[in-house]
């Protein structure tokens, strides 16, 4: 039997046909059109499912289930997507409409939770606890305890991006101030970079973005830091300090064996990881213990979200 995993992202929606060994046999990725509504969303996903079945000469009866990772709260009790402002609506029915449109059992979960499950299942871990923090447009997360995904009583656990790290800090889309993602997300890093560039017209960052701040990406900052640009190094220092504050909070609460950094920002590699490890180590309560949480970059590739989504039906 096969499974289909769908990773609904803010930029792209990817659907993959997954076999019993968790290998992706075929994959389709299309741009995510936002804002949207629940009916249009399930129509698009049903179309992706039909395309995968057709391309691989399979029938719906040969698919064990469809699993979907969504960037909002996935209420398993009523089958609705909730708190879905990023998608253009507040809430809406999801599981039953998609099941009717495909004829296949459907399961869903938060996208970062699904990525954590995919990472844990394919990354070769021998520990029974792992926390994943995804650094992308925002900050998400997933919690693996005793080898199982933990999503909380309201299916909204691991919203690490919305813990406060600065009182009266930068306003967040959630309505609060000083949330972790307003300082540690990819969007926050780009904001910091643009602000710093305006005060340092000689920075290499101007050259790296072609003189247009609107073209600044996270990669712009990391490339500047690797080249030794003073402004870029200052931005990176402040960014990793704020990241370390948030990660230390998570470690102090959960004490996981592994804390895994995923998402687009993690692709920066050691220039991000090394200062992050050092600064976090200074902030945790057990800094003198013989055994502490390993902070690593995600081992699985960008397909972890698809594989994790496919496993939501377990």
What is the role of each PLM region?
Residues 28-30, 85, 153:
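Short hydrophobic alpha-helix segments
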Residues 11-12, 112-114, 137-140, 167:
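Conserved A3 ("GATE") glycine/threonine-rich loop of ANL adenylate-forming enzymes
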Residues 109-123:
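Conserved PLP phosphate-binding loop immediately N-terminal to the Schiff-base lysine helix
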Residues 79-90:
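A charged helix-plus-loop insertion that forms the helical arch/lid used to bind
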Residues 7, 67-71, 109, 131-138, ...:
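Short beta-strand segments
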Residues 156-159:
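Structural signature of FAD isoalloxazine-binding scaffolds in flavoprotein oxidoreductases
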Residues 1-65, 75-78, 95-104, 121-127, ...:
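ATP-binding/phosphotransfer module of carbohydrate and carboxylate kinases, centering on a glycine-rich
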């Amino acid at each position: 039997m096969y499974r289909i995993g769908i990773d609904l992202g803010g930029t792209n929606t990817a659907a993959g046909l997954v076999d019993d060994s968790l290998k992706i046999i075929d994959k389709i990725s299309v741009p995510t059109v936002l804002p949207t509504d629940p009916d249009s969303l399930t129509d698009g996903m049903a179309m992706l499912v039909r395309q995968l079945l057709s391309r691989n000469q399979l029938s719906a009866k040969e698919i064990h289930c469809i699993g979907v990772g969504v960037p909002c709260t996935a209420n398993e009790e009523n089958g609705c997507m909730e708190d879905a402002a990023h998608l253009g609506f507040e809430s809406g029915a999801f599981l039953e409409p998609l099941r009717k449109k495909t004829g296949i059992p459907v399961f869903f979960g938060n996208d970062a939770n699904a990525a954590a499950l995919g990472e844990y299942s394919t990354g070769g871990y021998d520990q029974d606890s792992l926390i994943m923090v995804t650094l992308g447009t925002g900050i998400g997360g997933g919690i693996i305890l005793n080898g199982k995904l933990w999503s909380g009583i309201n299916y909204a656990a691991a919203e690490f991006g919305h813990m406060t790290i600065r009182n009266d800090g930068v306003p967040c889309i959630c309505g609060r101030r000083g949330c972790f993602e307003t300082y540690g997300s990819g969007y926050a890093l780009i904001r910091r970079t643009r602000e710093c560039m305006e005060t340092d017209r000689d920075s290499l960052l101007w050259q790296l973005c072609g003189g247009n701040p609107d073209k600044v990406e996270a990669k712009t900052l990391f490339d500047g830091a690797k080249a030794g640009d003073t402004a870029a190094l200052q931005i990176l220092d402040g960014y990793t300090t704020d990241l370390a504050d948030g990660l230390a909070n998570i470690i102090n609460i959960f004490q996981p064996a592994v804390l895994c950094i995923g998402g687009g920002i993690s692709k920066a590699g050691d220039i991000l990881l090394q200062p992050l490890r050092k600064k976090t180590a200074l902030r945790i309560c057990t800094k003198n213990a013989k055994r502490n949480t390993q902070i690593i970059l995600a081992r699985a590739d960008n397909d972890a979200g698809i594989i994790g989504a496919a496993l939501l039906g377990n």
